[in-house]
């Protein structure tokens, strides 16, 4: 891929966290760096292990291939390779690849003199994954509480965990996570729609300005957060969705073992309701 006209001046030495100048180069448009190498290593190794694990299983059906975590009897120990050990190695590879990618983003930010909003945002996605496969299993005492790597098996795990707590939608942190996910979609779709509508006026008319965009929302809802503000809001909403999704699963089991509908008993016990006792 040809280098764009403005790219050359940004391809400068330095900004690396590890390795100095050894891996400080580009392949086409892609910056490599030490963490680019480790990302590639962990990604290739993890993918190869998944394919090898599938070859040892009963099917090549893409929907049914599954790499399961160890049985609960192994606790937090190292399991035999074909009894969950493969899942443990793949998990290490996944974390290694994700963290390496985030650190590679940090190096790119350092080269460009930018702040670290992008790698910080990606780190929240890493947090959600690590919560599922490391933090929660450790708190519950067994790697077997992690989710399997497979399409249908993963969906079965989600369903089973939900039913373990009777009705997972009553989990307050889950409510917050879903609210932030939906609100992110709403905010970003409205923002995207606004930009496209301003950038695509009727034939023969000039492109509209940020004043038009601000005025639209002032007319529509009485307030405009502004061009920079909508991106701050979008980042906050998206990070909140990832954060509360991690919270909702990590409190289920380690800190709350009953059905989530029972958690709302405090609401019924508020003094305000005492004049209407339950019968």
Swiss-Prot record:
**InterPro entries given in the database record:** Photo_II_D1/D2_sf, Photo_RC_L, Photo_RC_L/M, Photo_RC_L/M_CS
Q: Which residues cross the membrane?
A: 33-56, 85-113, 116-141, 171-200, 226-252
A single Gene Ontology CC term: plasma membrane light-harvesting complex
The residues the record assigns to binding (7R,8Z)-bacteriochlorophyll b are 154, 174
Q: Which GO terms describe its molecular function?
A: bacteriochlorophyll binding; electron transporter, transferring electrons within the cyclic electron transport pathway of photosynthesis activity; metal ion binding
> Which is one Pfam family of this protein?
Photo_RC
Quote the record's binding site residues for a ubiquinone: 217
Keyword Cell membrane assigned: yes
Q: Example GO biological process term?
A: photosynthetic electron transport in photosystem II
Q: How does it sit in the membrane?
A: Multi-pass membrane protein
Predominant subcellular localization, coarse grouping: membrane
Residues annotated as binding Fe cation are 191, 231
Cell inner membrane listed as a keyword: yes
Record's subcellular location:
Cell inner membrane
Q: Mind listing the UniProt keywords for this protein, alphabetically?
A: Bacteriochlorophyll, Cell inner membrane, Cell membrane, Chlorophyll, Chromophore, Electron transport, Herbicide resistance, Iron, Magnesium, Membrane, Metal-binding, Photosynthesis, Reaction center, Transmembrane, Transmembrane helix, Transport
Oligomeric and partner information: Reaction center is composed of four bacteriochlorophylls, two bacteriopheophytins, two ubiquinones, one iron, and three highly hydrophobic polypeptide chains (designated L, M, and H).
The similarity annotation says:
Belongs to the reaction center PufL/M/PsbA/D family.
Its function, per the record, reads: The reaction center is a membrane-bound complex that mediates the initial photochemical event in the electron transfer process of photosynthesis.
What name has this protein been given in UniProt? Answer: Reaction center protein L chain
- The UniProt gene name for this protein comes to pufL
